[in-house]
C-alpha cells in the first residue's frame, strides 16, 4: 500500500509539472497574442478544463484519507492560482 501511495503522489506531481508547463506557455501566448478572439477561445477552453480538473481532484481528495490528500490539494491550489493569473492576463488583453 505504501508503494502505491508513493507512486500515486509522484504521478500527481508529474501531472502538476506538466500542467504548470502548459499554463506558462498558454499565458505567454495570450500575452503576446494580438487576436483577442483566439485568446478568448483558448481561455474559455482552459477555464472549462481547470474547472473539471479541480472538481475531479477535490472529489478524489474526499475519497482518499491519507497522505495523497495533501498532494491533491496542492495540485488544486496551484491550478487555482494559475487560473486566476490567466483571468488577469485575459482582462489586460481585452483592455488593449
UniProtKB/Swiss-Prot annotation:
Protein name, UniProt field: Uncharacterized protein C1687.08
Record field: transmembrane: 2-22, 38-58, 68-88
Major localisation: membrane
Cleaved signal peptide residues: none
Membrane topology qualifier: Multi-pass membrane protein
Keywords from the UniProt entry: Membrane, Transmembrane, Transmembrane helix
Subcellular location as annotated: Membrane
GO cellular component, one term: endoplasmic reticulum
Amino acid at each position: 500500500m505504501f508503494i502505491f501511495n508513493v507512486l500515486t503522489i509522484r504521478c500527481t506531481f508529474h501531472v502538476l509539472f506538466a500542467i504548470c508547463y502548459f499554463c506558462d506557455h498558454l499565458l505567454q501566448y495570450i500575452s503576446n497574442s494580438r487576436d483577442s478572439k483566439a485568446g478568448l477561445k483558448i481561455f474559455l477552453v482552459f477555464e472549462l478544463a481547470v474547472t473539471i480538473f479541480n472538481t475531479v481532484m477535490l472529489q478524489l481528495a474526499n475519497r482518499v484519507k491519507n497522505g495523497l490528500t495533501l498532494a491533491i490539494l496542492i495540485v488544486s491550489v496551484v491550478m487555482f492560482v494559475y487560473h486566476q493569473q490567466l483571468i488577469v492576463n485575459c482582462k489586460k488583453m481585452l483592455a488593449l
